Amino acid sequence: MRILIDIGHPAHVHLFKNFAKIMMGKGHQVLFTCREKEFEIELLKANGFTYQSFGKKYKSIIGKILGLLKFDYMEWKACRKFKPDILLSHGSMYAAHAAWLVRKPHIAFDDTYNMEQIHLYEPFTPVLLTGDYEHPRVSKKEIRYAGYHELSYLHPNYYTPNKDILKDLGVTPDEKYVLVRFIALNATHDIGNKGIPTKQKIEAVKALTKYAKVFISSEGVLPQELEQYRLKTRPEQLIDVMAFASLVWGESITIPAEAAVLGVPAMNNNNMKSYYLIDEQDNYGLCYCYKSNEDDLNKALQKCIELLKRDKQDLSAEWKAKRDKLLNDHIDVTAFLVWFVENYPGSKQIMTDNPDYQYRFK
């Protein structure tokens, strides 16, 4: 089988990497395509994947419209050359359109439920895989599975934190540190979302340094006052940094979701509603969701300080128990995807007739 996987965000590399390695180990051929947003290329190289880059993403609205035409054409050309049997993506309109043009199936994951994107790819996509938590039904083509995207790469079947990262960070096992994540807010679903004001970012980081070391991962330029806290590890080490943190806080949605699945207390300030983060908050108590207004920023900061004042081992043990419950309730997403793709389209019918079939993949 020849499989083309289109990547639109660094987290999508993680989403598909274990699936790709398993499929390649079975003799299937896999090609990744991508646009360059942040550090997708570094992650693809670190995993040894064959990939084709279509260049930089566009930031302006007009640029995004032009990019749709350009990247559609480049995806179609990649398909014509690679000749995939099936295409996979996280809601990629480019993969969907190219798949339709070459008359091959496109399987899409989705966990953001941005209708402006869904309208562009759903008509050309025969199946959408979405989590079984509460979220808007975006299509009659949905198949819901018991999991989150983050479980495809942070499930204990695939990931064990590397303690060597502590040496790279210059911290001891007993020392508290906070991972802070700031994002560029350039995606289509970020339009109108201004994020955390610079002044509040500086004030919050300064406040956190009174209780723990602070490391900042940022998509863009940091204020001069915060540059000293910039994380200097390699992109592929970010998850290890997160795994040993006492707390994760920031504007990003993906990073707090990863922290929650790892059993690390996570704080999110973002005006975009994240259904899976809300599920992890309401049903497991693993994270805290706030908006970016000043009142919510103060609430988030106070919650951060409250948690950082607690004993490190006690806090870690409490979050581990919460994580264990989450893992017990969900499937091995990668194992499920391997089965689903290898047996498609029969797997689609099986899941339609008997959704509980997925619990074989634990």
Regions found by a protein language model. Name each.
Residues N47-Y58, V180, L185, I202-R234:
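Catalytic donor nucleotide-activated moiety binding site of glycosyltransferases and closely related
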Residues L87-A98, A108-F109, L238-D279:
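A donor-sugar binding/catalytic signature common to diverse glycosyltransferases
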Residues I7, M24-G67:
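Conserved nucleotide-sugar phosphate-binding/catalytic loop shared by glycosyltransferases and other
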Residues L308-K362:
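C-terminal amphipathic helix plus adjacent low-complexity
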Residues V261-A321, K325:
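Catalytic binding pocket for nucleotide-activated donors in carbohydrate/polymer assembly enzymes
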Residues L129-G195:
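A nucleotide-sugar donor-handling region in carbohydrate enzymes
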Residues F71-E75, G220-I255:
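Donor nucleotide-activated moiety binding/catalytic core segment of transferases
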Residues H106-A108, I118-T130, M242:
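A conserved, positively charged/aromatic
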